[in-house]
Amino acid sequence: MLKFQEAAKCVSGSTAISTYPKTLIARRYVLQQKLGSGSFGTVYLVSDKKAKRGEELKVLKEISVGELNPNETVQANLEAQLLSKLDHPAIVKFHASFVEQDNFCIITEYCEGRDLDYKIQEYKEAGKIFPDNQIIEWFIQLLLGVDYMHERRILHRDLKSKNIFLKNNLLKIGDFGVSRLLMGSCDLATTLTGTPHYMSPEALKHQGYDTKSDIWSLACILYEMCCMNHAFAGSNFLSIVLKIVEGDTPSLPERYPKELNTIMESMLNKNPSLRPSAIEILKIPYIDEQLQHLMCRHSEMTLEDKNLDCQKEAARLINAMQKRIHLQTLRALSEVQKMTPRERMRLRKLQAADERARKLKKIVEEKYEENSKRMQELRSRNFQQLSVDVLHEKTHLIGMEEKEEQPEGRPSCSPQDEDEERWQDREEEFDEPTLENLSEPQPIPSMDLRKLESIVEDATSDLGYHEIPEDPLVAEEYYADAFDSYCEESDEEEEEIVLAGPEKEIKNEGSQPTYRTNQQDSDIEALARCLENVLGCTSLDTKTIPSMAADVSPGPTIFNSVMARTKMKRMRESAMQKLGTEVFEEVYNYLKRARHQNASEAEIRERLEKVVPRASDCFEVDQLLYFEEQLLITMGK
């Protein structure tokens, strides 16, 4: 089962969504399959009927929230609108949310690579580890996403490997805001939704949750990517809490760069004010150098993708044009087949006349180009051989040239021709030796249209068409003779003429090229832009978030006790299914007494191992007791 949420659990309870495939939800989303279940609810893969091509698949999270009060519903919708405006390549896109009966439904972006926890477990079982450069790249992507949220005063509150998803090998932060949407912004809401392995000391001690708490969780994820294990592990819930609050700071193995280990240790500082912010980490020289390498690589990838997309787009346009021509040809063929033999013959002769006109036009254009080129060469040759000093030319010579009369019998010329004659006269007066070597300009031959028409007739004589006789009786006999052979052969000829091209095109219709979706391209391009923005930002003052900044997003401020009880009910049902009802009751009652009596961890472990094979199997029961106690304290206040 896919690990999109908490460890998969079989949860009973009411549901507003049918598990049958192809079910239509909210008149827009078609249910494809169930992806998994978690502590909050069930996750489905759906297809959006109104989405763009290539972006139809989305994820629907169905969360049972009980009967929400009207003010809680309104505030949850306001928070959903805020989350839907977030747009970053390292954050899962939040599309929409709606309430259906006693379920709150959230529509988010679909990531086909599953979550980071699944990827880590897959590598761990295979005995492999992630390459250093891959870890650095993923870590930088997470830093960019966290910095984007913190700039907008939005806290995640539940950063962990199961809430980070892979899409085209890019990490995307997801499932944030769920606690704010459903349980409010109090400390207990964070404790109930958070996973103990990633929770910061101040969150466990109810000293407040701020941006530096997300930084702590991010450091735990970095350690998990490097070591394939949790940074703070233990056999039960309280042992993990003690390690986080009072234990030593873990270190990375020696195979990783010292700079990376130093950064992680600073992020795991138990004093929140001493932890660096996301933008401060991005400005550390070691990370800044890695940023530059990533930006160069992503820029090259973007350029290659654009070139490839241009080629694919050109191929797509060619295929579309060929298909259009094919359809037009089929329509024309159908029109021809509906004609009578006389109409077909007339159409054929009209086509022959059009072809003859096109050839005439082509020959005229060629002759015109030839004459123009020849005139240009003559003008250029005469102009290059002039040796007149225009600046020192005598004014009386110019006056004499202007008064010269035109030769008899010579037609009047345009002003442009007069200028050419002046230059030629100056050549004769000032540079006679040069002009003697010049060949006299040849007159441009006039075009004989009759001769041109005869040439075209000779060129088109191979068509085998003859003029229609003007005499009606002769023409009737002419048509009768022509149609005998035409009716038998014309259909085949028409098919050869009209369908010569489309046959190849029809064969190519079946093999359409696969296109990369716009979303994949935009993620890489957007990530490259984010890297450029971070490298271009030289001042930390403009982006640094105060270490103790409160989460001021317009979210719910009232704690939803119904949602908290629902979560604990699911946790109890899951533990009962794992241990059995009798064993669960025995473990639950014993741990409740042991915690009140402050029994030692060794004593508790020894007693639990007599009831269950492993003491770690009771982790969920221990966590349930802790949550119940915290809930009573909160409700008492």
Swiss-Prot record:
Activity control: Autorepressed by intramolecular binding of the C-terminus which dissociates following phosphorylation by NEK2. Activated in response to DNA damage. Inhibited by zinc.
Coiled-coil residue windows: 302-385
Subcellular location: Nucleus; Nucleus, Nucleolus
Class of enzymatic activity (EC top level): transferase
Modification note: Phosphorylated by NEK2. Phosphorylation at Ser-273 is important for its activation.
GO MF terms, alphabetically ordered: ATP binding; metal ion binding; protein serine kinase activity; protein serine/threonine kinase activity
Keywords: ATP-binding, Cell cycle, Coiled coil, Kinase, Magnesium, Manganese, Metal-binding, Nucleotide-binding, Nucleus, Phosphoprotein, Serine/threonine-protein kinase, Transferase
Major localisation: nucleus
UniProt-annotated catalytic positions: 158
Residues with the Phosphoserine modification: 273
Pfam families: Pkinase
Chemical reaction(s) catalysed: L-seryl-[protein] + ATP = O-phospho-L-seryl-[protein] + ADP + H(+); L-threonyl-[protein] + ATP = O-phospho-L-threonyl-[protein] + ADP + H(+)
Protein kinase domain span: 29-287
Binding locations of ATP: 35-43, 61
CC cofactor: Mn(2+); Mg(2+)
Region (Disordered): 399-446
Keyword Lipid metabolism: no
InterPro entries: Kinase-like_dom_sf (IPR011009), NEK_Ser/Thr_kinase_NIMA (IPR051131), Prot_kinase_dom (IPR000719), Ser/Thr_kinase_AS (IPR008271)
Bias (Acidic residues) ranges: 416-434
GO aspect biological process, one term: intracellular signal transduction
The protein's role, per its UniProt record: Protein kinase which plays an important role in the G2/M checkpoint response to DNA damage. Controls degradation of CDC25A by directly phosphorylating it on residues whose phosphorylation is required for BTRC-mediated polyubiquitination and degradation.
Subunit structure: Interacts with NEK2.
Family of this protein: Belongs to the protein kinase superfamily. NEK Ser/Thr protein kinase family. NIMA subfamily.
Protein name: Serine/threonine-protein kinase Nek11
Organism in which the protein naturally occurs: Macaca fascicularis
